[in-house]
Curated annotation (Swiss-Prot):
Glycosylation site positions: N302, N346, N398, N493, N523, N696, N745
Cytoplasmic face of the membrane: 579-587, 609-619, 811-860
Chief location category: membrane
Protein name in the entry: Glutamate receptor 1.3
Assembly mode: May form heteromers.
Species the sequence originates in: Arabidopsis thaliana (Mouse-ear cress)
Cited SUPFAM superfamilies: Periplasmic binding protein-like I (SSF53822), Periplasmic binding protein-like II (SSF53850)
Location in the cell: Membrane
Tissue localization of expression: Expressed predominantly in roots.
GO annotation (BP), single: calcium-mediated signaling
One Gene Ontology term, aspect cellular component: plasma membrane
InterPro entries: ANF_lig-bd_rcpt (IPR001828), GABAb_receptor_plant_PBP1 (IPR044440), Ionotropic_Glu_rcpt (IPR015683), Iontro_rcpt_C (IPR001320), Iontropic_Glu_rcpt_pln (IPR017103), Peripla_BP_I (IPR028082), Solute-binding_3/MltF_N (IPR001638)
Membrane topology listed for this record: Multi-pass membrane protein
């Protein structure tokens, strides 16, 4: 019985515990359902190239990050859900996918934009839709800063450029060769590095670009060129795919041995993964690289462990978590935190604003956005040893180096670096053939049409090629600071320099550069690299100097001469009318009065009028006219002075011929301009032809580039003058093969020659040109139209004076005119009064006397 009771109690206790567990489970399930009903879904788009290793890593990283985040924050009311789209590595498809996510899924943010073009397209879309666009590891570009809704997660290219430059300066290397990937992303991100090199005295000796499709033979050929130039320090800025071909080729050419330095940028190092084969790793022995620093932490170790456990067998290649994956993890955390904040009561900020304010300790370290950029400015310096990476130091924020992460030092102390070839001794970084003169194969133009510019001939005795002229002197002065032995090769295929540019481009094994009267054009620049121009830019016109004995008539046009003469006479007439009644100097016989009128009017030209004016009205007329004369004489003097020093060219499209250099594309372009299109042209072949055609008037003037015309002026300084026109050409430059290391150096030397006046001295020596022979066609005759306002003022003033004079006359005789006289008598009386005002004494004028007598008889 007792045993039964015990069993009954045990059963009841078990049932009670079971009932309590069921009730708790039910309550928990009910609460979960309630909570689940309150959770808000925040949709985020993910646009990736799922066919790439990077795309797969980012996808898994974001998914795992969100799962882990909500596992440790189960009480959050929001849930970020991801909508995935595959861009297949196509920027336009990525844009289309982003638009689809916005329309169909209503996403509130999009993660993508792994290339520069994708980032720009998504940035534009973000501006239109006002939705945050998050770009992972897109290259640094100032062009992206204008997008206010674009967030970038990448390394700080400015800090990296300073670090690499400081690293090169620490070892006292003064020149490097840039080996880069010829793609927009890599070219754009390389520009900042090149700028820092120039600012800090690191000379870029050469640039060599490769693409993913570059063959092994092409890679070997370009590396061989670098080796021939004696390059020992290489800065590599390209993707992992190209690196797997580059370093084995470099090793076969002996460029991975003692004395060589290979430096990898952070973008290159960050793209490396564990799937590089052992052969490539062995070839990279001794390479030094900059890599974005990810601090080791418990969280990173745990995430890496979960990462590896979650990978399916078919994705075994994703074993190693990349830096992009770590940044994607932290971005997902930031999105989840920001999504929770914006759903809180009394919060009015947007998702973009909350993301930019979010700060936490993530897998990449201290996560904080600065100006919408997650800029990782912490770098570790890696030394490739065998198949492993060995950290030899850190790049500090001040640009110095240390062998410990938290040690701020200005002494640039690093761990021992094992360089290519296995040596621990720092390479000198000097050219392998600095002690030997390098040979430069130069094509020289040999048409000899303008010997002062370029003259090529063979010595009949020694059979030696003799090269002279202004162009070759500038070239020799520009290349003299560099240790080159120059071999001149005449270009015998005429004056078509487009073909010369193509020959230089296509026959790289034969020629390195070209020198001569070669104009810089956009078409030629597609095949070769040009230096800075060493001549004046633009076209000019040369004509025979005019020696006219009537040059003093040219400042004013005929209509202005006639109008001015008319107003001189009119001034004298009006003053005579006003002064004649009271001023004896304006009285006398008709010939005397006509002489006074003409004398007074024209004497105002030189302010020589001596007649004393008694009437204020005449003084007003003279004052206005003297003001006008002052303007006319000043303008005439200035224009005449200009015309005496500046010659002018008159175009007559119906009669004139214009000369130009035969076969010159530049001259042909000039002849199609609006002012010269209708004129007839004549091709000439040399400076002597130019002079002869101008002197015998076969052509009225010659149009060509300024250097050619300066030769003509130098040979005939007393016969011709030149008018410089618009700078429609780019001047002469030296041509080099694309990417040739001497181009920036020679351009720098040309700039020095110009600023030091040495280039000007060379021009004077070869062209004998002086400033009076070069003028601007700016002195045009003054037209009546330009002075129409002045003459309107004068005309109105004169009309006003005449009106006042008439009113005064009428006022004095008004009673007589209106007193019992009909209209005909009034007019007759007014005529008599006017005659008397001209001839005050009737005895002096019988006509006037008769008129007075007739008037008196009529009144009686």
């Amino acid at each position: 019985m007792e045993r039964f009771c015990i069993q009954t109690q045990t059963l009841l206790s078990f049932l009670l515990v079971l009932l309590l567990f069921i009730s708790r489970s039910f309550a928990s399930t009910k609460n979960d359902d309630v909570d689940g009903g309150k959770r808000v879904q925040i949709r985020v788009g993910l646009v990736l190239d799922l066919g790439s290793l990077k795309g797969k890593i980012v996808k898994n990283s974001v998914s795992m990050a969100l799962s882990y985040f909500y596992a440790i924050h189960n009480d959050y009311k929001t849930r970020v859900s991801v909508s995935l789209r595959n861009s297949h590595g196509e920027p336009l498809l990525a844009l289309a996918s982003a638009v689809d996510l916005l329309k169909t899924e209503g996403v509130e943010a999009i993660i993508g934009g792994n290339s520069l073009l994708e980032a720009k397209l998504l940035g534009e879309l973000g501006e239109k839709a006002r939705v945050p666009m998050i770009s992972l590891d897109s290259p640094f570009s100032l062009s992206l800063s204008k997008y206010t809704h674009l967030i970038q997660a990448t390394h700080d290219s400015t800090s990296e450029a300073k670090g690499i430059t400081s690293f090169i300066n620490v070892f006292d290397w003064n020149s490097v060769a840039l080996v880069y990937e010829d793609h927009d992303d890599w070219r754009e991100s390389m520009q900042l590095l090149v700028e820092h090199f120039h600012e800090n005295g690191v000379r870029v000796q050469s640039k060599v670009g490769f693409t993913v499709s570059s063959s092994e033979d092409f890679v070997m050929g370009r590396l061989q060129q670098l080796k021939d130039l004696g390059t020992t320090v290489f800065v590599v800025h390209l993707s992992e795919v190209i690196a797997t071909h580059l370093f084995p080729c470099a090793r076969r050419l002996g460029l991975m041995g003692d004395g060589f330095v290979w430096i990898l940028t952070a973008k290159t190092m960050n793209s490396f993964h564990e799937n590089i084969d052992d052969f490539t790793k062995q070839a990279m022995e001794g390479v030094v690289g900059f890599k974005s620093y990810i601090p080791m932490s418990i969280e990173l170790q745990n995430f890496t462990l979960r990462w590896r456990k979650s990978l399916p067998v078919e994705e075994a290649e994703l074993t190693r978590l990349s830096i992009s994956g770590i940044w994607a993890h932290d971005i997902a955390f930031a999105l989840a935190r920001a999504a929770e904040v914006i759903r809180m009561p009394n919060v009015t900020s947007t998702l973009l604003e909350e993301i930019t304010k979010t700060r936490f300790n993530g897998l990449s370290g201290d996560f904080q956005l600065n100006d919408k950029k997650l800029l990782s400015n912490k770098f570790e310096i890696i030394n490739m040893i065998g198949s492993s990476e060995r950290r030899v130091g850190f790049l500090n924020s001040n640009g110095s180096f240390s062998n410990r992460r938290h040690l701020s030092s200005t002494h640039n102390k690093l761990e021992t670096i094992i360089w290519p070839g296995g040596s621990a001794q720092s390479p000198k970084g000097t050219s392998l053939i600095d002690s030997d003169r390098k040979k430069l194969r130069v094509l020289v133009t040999s048409s000899n049409r303008f010997p002062r510019l370029m003259k090529v001939e063979t010595d009949p005795v020694t059979n030696e090629l003799i090269v002279e002229g202004f162009c070759i002197e500038v070239f020799r002065a520009s290349i003299s600071p560099f240790n080159y032995e120059v071999e001149y090769i005449p270009w015998l295929n005429g004056s078509n320099y487009d073909n010369l540019a193509y020959a230089l481009h296509s026959q790289k094994d034969k020629y390195d550069a070209a020198v001569g009267d070669i104009t810089i054009t956009s078409n030629r620049s597609t095949y070769v690299d040009f230096t800075l121009p060493f001549t004046e830019m633009g076209l000019g016109i040369v004509a025979v100097k005019e020696r006219s004995m009537w040059v003093f008539f040219q400042p004013l046009t005929p209509d202005l001469w006639i109008t001015s003469a008319f107003f001189f006479v009119l001034t004298g007439v009006i003053v005579w009318l006003i002064e004649r009644a009271e001023n004896k100097e304006f009285q006398g016989s008709w010939p005397q009065q006509i002489g006074v009128v003409l004398w007074f009017g024209f004497s105002t030209l030189v302010y020589a009028h001596r007649e004393k004016l008694k009437h204020n009205l005449s003084r007003f007329v003279v004052t206005v006219w003297v003001f006008a004369v002052l303007i006319l004489t000043a303008s005439y003097t200035a224009t005449l002075t200009s015309m005496m020093t500046v010659q002018q060219i008159r175009f007559n499209s119906n009669e004139d011929y214009v000369g130009h250099l035969s076969g010159s594309l530049i001259a042909n372009v000039a002849l199609t301009s609006s002012s010269l299109r209708a004129m007839r042209s004549l091709g000439l072949n040399s400076a002597a032809d130019y002079a002869q055609a101008l002197l015998n008037k076969t052509v009225s003037f010659v149009v060509d580039e300024l250097p050619y015309l300066k030769v003509v002026l130098g040979e005939n300084p007393t016969h011709f003058f030149m008018v410089k026109t618009q700078s429609t050409t780019n001047g002469f430059g030296f041509m080099f093969q694309k990417g040739f290391e001497l181009v920036p150096n020679v351009s720098r030397e040309i700039s020095k020659l110009r600023t030091s006046e040495k280039l000007n001295e060379m021009e004077k020596r070869w062209f004998d040109n002086q400033l009076p022979y070069t003028t601007d066609d700016t002195s045009n005759p003054i037209t009546l139209y330009r002075f129409r306002g002045l003459f309107i003022i004068i005309g109105v003033s004169f009309a006003f004076a005449l009106a006042v004079l008439v009113i005064l006359c009428l006022r004095d005789k008004w009673e007589i005119l209106v007193d019992n006289l009909d209209l005909s008598q009034r007019l007759r009386h007014f005529r008599i009064h006017f005659v008397r005002s001209i001839h005050t004494s009737p005895l002096d004028d019988p006509i006037g006397e008769t008129a007075v007598q007739m008037a008196q008889q009529n009144r009686q």
